[in-house]
Structure formats: structure tokens, C-alpha cells
């Protein structure tokens, strides 16, 4: 956990804003899947708004490798907190994507990143997002990038996610939401509780 965390601190350089690389409080394969993480992110966002003047409608989520696993989990659960999200080299597991209706979402994976069948699973999830958007043209904004001849490390091609995400501003009151609960139960989503 510490090795990847130290790497992530300097991996991306956004053109504007504050870049934060949080460390999970425990060392476990499912470090980002557990319920206390949601509260940690909520409090981190609130502190950044109050202490650093961060615009709450311009908060973005991204993660690489195990952090990408976390994006797969956190983005659908906390879609109401972010303006956009980008997942890099993570495994989706069995997560549902329906809650991403109002959260622009990017998928990045190397075509040769076959550990745990990660490459095929990311491609499948990209097609699932295509299908969701086909049935809901005003939602499910997304891009899927399965990079040929790249493995788990994508030579920073995935950094293209930053300017893409920065184009989006969160709408805290969208006309339509989809809220499906999974492993971690939440007591509210957007304005519904």
C-alpha cells in the first residue's frame, strides 16, 4: 500500500486545483471497498472546501491500480460528490454502473493488462457504459480506452483523463437520478435520503 501510495503522490499534475493522493487506512485487498472510506472521502472533501476554498462542484476522482479498484467502487456509491471520475488499471469486480448516470466516467486499461482478466473486464464495462448511454442519451457520459501494447503501466497516456475531467462541473440537483445500493449502504444520494 505505501509503495503505490508514494508513487501516486506525483503521478499526475493537474493544470489547476489541488491534487490529493489519499492512503487507505488499512492494508487489505479491498481497502477502498469498505464503508469507512465513504465517510473519509466526505470529510476530506468538506475540509478542502472549508480550508482550501475548493469548489464543491469541481471535485474529481481518479485512481490507478488498487486506486482504480477504488474508483470502480466509490464512483457509483458517491456519484453525487464528484464532477467526473477516471479509473486507471483497476478491476471492476461485480460493481453496478447504473448510478453513474450523472457522473462522467473514463476507463483506462492496457490491452495486455491480463492479471485477474482486468483488460477484458474493463472492455466489458466500457461496452456496458455504451449500452447505458444508448438507452439514456442525456446521461452516462463516458470514454473507454483499452490501450494496445500496454500492460499495467500505460506510460502516462492515461494522464489525458485530467483535461477531460476538468471540462465537467457537478450538477448537485440533476433532473433524474438512479440510485442502486450494493455492498456499502448509504443513507442519502443527491437530495434523496
Model feature map: region roles:
Residues 1-50:
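Active-site machinery of serine-nucleophile hydrolases
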Residues 106-110:
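Short beta-strand/loop motif that positions the catalytic acidic residue
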Residues 15-19, 55-59, 78-84, 101-105, ...:
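Loop/turn elements at helix/coil->beta-strand transitions in domains of secreted/extracellular proteins
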Residues 33-41, 66, 116-121:
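Phosphate/oxyanion-binding active-site loops and adjacent basic polyanion-contact surfaces
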Residues 130-193:
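Alpha/beta-hydrolase-fold serine-hydrolase catalytic core, especially in secreted/extracellular enzymes
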Residues 111-142:
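Active-site-adjacent alpha-helix of alpha/beta-hydrolase-fold enzymes
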Residues 57-101:
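Primarily recognizes the serine-hydrolase "nucleophile elbow" in alpha/beta-hydrolase
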Residues 24-25, 111-114, 149-150:
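Acidic beta-to-alpha connecting loop that harbors the catalytic carboxylate
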Amino acid at each position: 500500500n505505501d509503495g503505490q501510495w508514494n508513487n501516486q503522490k506525483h503521478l499526475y499534475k493537474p493544470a489547476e486545483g489541488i491534487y490529493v493522493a489519499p492512503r487507505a487506512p488499512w492494508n487489505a485487498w479491498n481497502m477502498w471497498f469498505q464503508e469507512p472510506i465513504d465517510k473519509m472521502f466526505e470529510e476530506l472533501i468538506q475540509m478542502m472546501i472549508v480550508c482550501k476554498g475548493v469548489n464543491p462542484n469541481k471535485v474529481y476522482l481518479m485512481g490507478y491500480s488498487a486506486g482504480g479498484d477504488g474508483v470502480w467502487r466509490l464512483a457509483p456509491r458517491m456519484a453525487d460528490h464528484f464532477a467526473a471520475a477516471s479509473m486507471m488499471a483497476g478491476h471492476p469486480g461485480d460493481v453496478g454502473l447504473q448510478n453513474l448516470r450523472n457522473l462522467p466516467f473514463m476507463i483506462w486499461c492496457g490491452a495486455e493488462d491480463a492479471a485477474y482478466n482486468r483488460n477484458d473486464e474493463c472492455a466489458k464495462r466500457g461496452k456496458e457504459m455504451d449500452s447505458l448511454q444508448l438507452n439514456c442519451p442525456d446521461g452516462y457520459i463516458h470514454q473507454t480506452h483499452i490501450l494496445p501494447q500496454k500492460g499495467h503501466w500505460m506510460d502516462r497516456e492515461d494522464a489525458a483523463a485530467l483535461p477531460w475531467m476538468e471540462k465537467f462541473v457537478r450538477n448537485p440537483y440533476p433532473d433524474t437520478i438512479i440510485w442502486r445500493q450494493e455492498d456499502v449502504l448509504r443513507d442519502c444520494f443527491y437530495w434523496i435520503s
